[in-house]
Amino acid sequence: FPKAKIFLGDSGSYLLGSFIAITVIKTSIANPEISPFYFCIILFYLFFEVFFSFFRKLIKEKKSPMLPDEKHLHMLLYKMLLKKNTDKIKSNYYVSIFINTAYLILIIPAIFMMENGEFCKYYSLIFFIIYIFSYKKMSNKL
């Protein structure tokens, strides 16, 4: 992996996410045969991470949701890996590989079922459950 040259931070990530959302909405309108839930599946991690972090900070921690923190799912995974491996760069690589591979595995069935609204709706719920379960399990270990 090349060393990172760009750092977006939370606000930059939110801005980039907004651009992606606009693109997805336009694509969804142009292709009505594809279930809107399919797009939810494709973008689930990106958007749910934002909403989950926003409400976690605002409601649970009672602080500004615009303040950065290290309690995102990928940061929890990174911290867990650092406990076993002190090499920060390798731990960062492993987090990227793990999250992208897991996400790809979860998305593949949706690609083949993108026109089946019922499947995509319930599959979105599975994503939600997996995210919450993973987050709670990792946050309890730290």
What are these regions (language model features)?
Residues F1-L142:
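Alpha-helical transmembrane segments
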